Amino acid sequence: MKKLFAILLCVCMILSVVACAPATNNNGTTEPEKTEAEYKLGMGVVVSSASSKTGLAQIDATVAAVVTDKDGKIVAARIDVAQNKFDLTADFATEVAKTFETKMELGSRYGMEGKVDNDGNGVMKEWDAQAKAFETYVVGKTSAEVNSIELQEAGGHQIAVDKVLLDAGCSMQITDFIAAVVKACNDEQGMTFKTAETFTLGVAAKSTAAESTAATAEADGTIKLYSDFAANVVAGDKIIAAVNDAIQPNIAVNTLGEIVSAEFKGTKRELKEGYNMAAFGQSMDWNGDGKVLEWYLQSAEFSKFVVGKTAAEVEAMATKEVEGAGYIISADDALLTAGCTIQITAIKAVVAQAAKNAR
């Protein structure tokens, strides 16, 4: 009996050692155990109408998404630009209905490769390749370090001084890149998350001019180049952190195609209570709870709601139309009860796209 007990004890000890042993890969080498760490996802948007001129209304919106670690160092960064142009000399209805693509979406069709050699090293990469070089360059840096990237003037552009970045192929103007990344690092409304998994990061922008109005002899027109933005952290195929935002810049134009004025007060998240959605009160109380949250709070609830979902599941979220209002809101009681009763068609689309763009 004692011998049997001793044998069983030995077997248990062996199984215990095997169970506690580190995992090995197919090459027979030991893989280090993954430790859960805390990160923060932030997003920043920099908007300019400076390229607008007679015959052209233009909004350039540079968006950056970053993941920072507990020390505030960037572990991943993604950048894109919604460069939206409205030709004031073309057919108005055609311009209002057109589809906008971001610079990343355009890829080689953007047409920069081989054309701009600001630093004279003979390397002239496409815009997307240069942006990706900048994304890689800022990894490991803090917000302050990114903000301190040294610049030089070259051909009327503010480009990097550091040969590391120039030799990597990024020789285009990077002032808005820097500003957007710094904003993203300092995003007070970003989402904190913990994970031990390997993750990817995606950013997306969706734009429209559908709400624009044409100029008449009686009144100026307004070109409304509106954009929605989203940033997602994805592990496996599921979103583990999310942020979304939107801009509504307005450019007033006359019948001669001249720019009368341009107005942009900030992104909807930046405006907070200044966006004044809550002021509408009962008229926008789509869930009937007697209150209307400000836009940035509703946006945050949507971001929380999509955590754990795939891009396909976000796209498939059920919606319903508010009778008599034309608003398309969520049909999910959980999201409505949380206070997110804003129109979500554009938000759904851009959040799903950001998850698909994760790399």
Q: Which stretches of residues belong to each language-model region?
A:
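Positively charged n-region of N-terminal signal peptides that target proteins for export
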Residues: M1-L8
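N-terminal cationic leader/targeting segments used for protein routing and processing
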Residues: K3, N26-G28, G266
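Bacterial lipoprotein signal-peptidase II cleavage site
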Residues: V18-T30
